[in-house]
């Protein structure tokens, strides 16, 4: 399974940083990372709601994690009302200073790097700020964001600059996302590009057998269906028949412990802390929208905590999907507007020059098959018989469903999507 995501924000002339440079890092504040994780969750659900309302009949796939981290870079460089607006959208009300957030951000990066070295699943997330080489970058930004800062020549080497950014994205996503930026998207007027690239490649803890993958119907309505390659297996998985969400919630774990270290006779969650969570509503016209309206960070947490091991037959479509999103209108609906407005944007912690975010893009790609899934992103049938969902013997994803790639350790929604119609998805 391959999953990839890229978030990009291009900055044009029209940024200041007291909050980042005014206070030294305090190692005692690093435990605030738990608040950062909760903010990421709330942001993820808010972004999902905006996107699904904008595309009510389409398939959806994106990485809220990637977008959140690209916006964190903007937040670290912002000041004044721009900073306040970003803090609200990123759910940073718990932090009394920008340095608290940066400390949590640094610890998250350290923890992610340490965990990656100890597990077979590949998950990486990289942040980068590409500055114009003639743009004055504050000494504070160079010191505090040293790993993220790179200066390039947008003005006289425009095409080479575009290639540099695209090459960085391709490298971070293991060549899954190439040519993110087209020829007209970097110009001599570009002053700065904020980027995050996320990549995940994982094997199912319990793999589907290819010989059991057969053509089966996927229903988009009671009278309309398409044949899909349906993967099937029987096993013990964590399941919650969720009355609050009015859906069945199943966790398909990835292998995050090397086989030599796996515990024998363990529960489904002991050898994995990253899963694809499948949220399957009943099959009627408004059930998916009903579930989405009930979903938030707390309801997702509660549902996952209440799950119990069940022996169950699972059917899941095999699919591959890529989505490109223009983030400006999505972020505007979430409450981000000032950083795009040249007349009011302030990024004083990065530079003394007046600049604003000109454009923002997100690309996400996922492949799900019998072995597992690969994802990358870059940010430049059952029915209710009563009010309670029926306990299933089968979990058949043969009608529209929601999926979330969830990291239990950090309580992060890494990727999320809605599978509505297989006609527009590669199988």
UniProtKB/Swiss-Prot annotation:
Disruption phenotype: Larval lethal. Larvae develop melanotic spots and display an increase in the activity of the activated form of prophenoloxidase 1 (PPO1), phenoloxidase (PO). Larvae display enhanced activation of the Toll signaling pathway, with increased Tl, spz and Drs expression. RNAi-mediated knockdown of maternal and zygotic expression results in adults that have a reduced lifespan. Wing development appears to be unaffected, however after emergence from the pupal case adult wings fail to unfold and instead remain folded and hypotrophic until death. It holds the Pfam family Serpin. Residues 1-18 form the signal peptide. The keyword Zinc does not apply. Glycans are attached at residue 224. The record marks 386-387 as: Reactive bond. The keyword Secreted applies. Serine protease inhibitor with activity toward trypsin. Negatively regulates the Toll signaling pathway and suppresses the expression of the antifungal peptide drosomycin. Its negative regulation of the Toll signaling pathway also results in the inhibition of the melanization immune response via the phenoloxidase (PPO1) cascade. Essential for unfolding and expansion of the wings after emergence from the pupal case. May regulate the Toll pathway by blocking the proteolysis of the Toll ligand spz. This is Serine protease inhibitor 88Ea.
């Amino acid at each position: 399974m391959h999953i990839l995501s890229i978030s990009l924000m291009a900055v044009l002339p029209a940024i200041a940083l007291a909050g980042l440079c005014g206070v030294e890092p305090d190692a005692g504040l690093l435990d605030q990372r738990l608040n950062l994780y909760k903010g990421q969750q709330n942001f993820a659900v808010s972004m999902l709601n905006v996107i699904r309302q904008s595309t009510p009949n389409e398939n959806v796939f994106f990485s809220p994690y990637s977008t959140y981290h690209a916006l964190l870079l903007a937040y670290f460089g912002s000041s004044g009302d721009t900073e306040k607006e970003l803090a609200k959208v990123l759910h940073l009300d718990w932090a009394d200073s920008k340095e608290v957030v940066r400390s949590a951000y640094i610890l998250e990066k350290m923890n992610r790097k340490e965990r990656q070295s100890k597990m077979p699943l590949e998950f990486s997330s990289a942040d980068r700020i590409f500055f114009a080489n003639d743009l004055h970058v504050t000494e504070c930004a160079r010191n505090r964001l040293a790993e993220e800062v790179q200066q390039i020549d947008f003005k006289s080497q425009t095409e080479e600059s575009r290639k540099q950014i695209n090459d960085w994205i391709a490298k971070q996503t293991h060549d899954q996302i190439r040519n993110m930026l087209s020829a007209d998207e970097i110009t001599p007027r570009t002053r700065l590009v904020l980027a995050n690239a996320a990549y995940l490649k994982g094997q199912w803890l319990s793999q589907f057998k290819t010989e059991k993958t057969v053509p089966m119907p996927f229903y988009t309505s009671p009278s309309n269906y398409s044949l899909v390659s349906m993967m099937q297996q029987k096993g013990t998985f964590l399941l919650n028949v969720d009355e609050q969400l009015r859906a069945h919630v199943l966790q398909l774990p990835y292998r995050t412990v090397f086989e030599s270290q796996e515990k024998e006779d363990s529960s489904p969650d002991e050898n994995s802390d990253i899963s694809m969570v499948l949220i399957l509503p009943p099959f009627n016209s408004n059930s998916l929208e009903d579930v989405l309206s009930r979903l938030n960070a707390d309801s997702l947490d509660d549902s996952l905590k209440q799950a119990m091991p069940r022996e169950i037959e699972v059917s899941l479509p095999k699919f591959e999907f890529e989505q490109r999103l223009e983030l400006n209108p999505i972020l505007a609906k979430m409450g981000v507007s000032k950083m795009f407005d040249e007349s009011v944007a302030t990024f004083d912690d990065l530079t003394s020059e007046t600049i604003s975010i000109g454009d923002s893009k997100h690309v996400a790609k996922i492949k799900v098959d019998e072995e597992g899934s690969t994802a990358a992103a870059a940010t430049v049938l059952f029915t209710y018989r009563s009010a309670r969902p029926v306990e299933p013997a089968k979990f058949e994803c043969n009608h529209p469903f929601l999926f979330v790639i969830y990291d239990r350790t950090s309580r992060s929604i890494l990727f999320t999507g809605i599978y509505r119609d297989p006609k527009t998805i590669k199988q």
